[in-house]
Amino acid sequence: MPELPEVETTKLSLEPLIGQTVTCVQVRHPRLRYDIAKDLDGLVGFVLTKIQRRAKYLLLDFYHAHDSRQKTLLIHLGMSGSLQQHINEPPRKHDHVLIDFADSHGKIITLHYHDPRRFGMILWLINDDYIDQPNTYARFLAHLG
């Protein structure tokens, strides 16, 4: 299982994606610890605005100019998960989610969520609806203080 230093290193490696726009989302294998939302491709057009770490959870905040609600991906890497950035690389066997980001020059970077054991999770949270959603921050993060 990735320890805190690895999760923090992952967070820091993702920071160059802040300010970039999601251009494509591909869920290749939706079954992880919790099923990945079928409408995760709704992130297309959103801009990554902030990345946070709470214990071993990563929180990626997204904003869209035409949608006032902030959306967050809550990610846990599980025992064998990783987030890796690639340019023009085909997905590997255990790459479950691919998210394409475009910078202001149109350069595409693909974020691969790789998890051979499938113990990790990716939850899509709409921040206005935290209380009404069964998989909320509170459920996973409240005990962290």
Q: Which stretches of residues belong to each language-model region?
A:
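Extended, highly charged segments
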Residues: 1-68, 98-107
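Phosphate/anion-contacting hairpin/loop surfaces
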Residues: 68-145
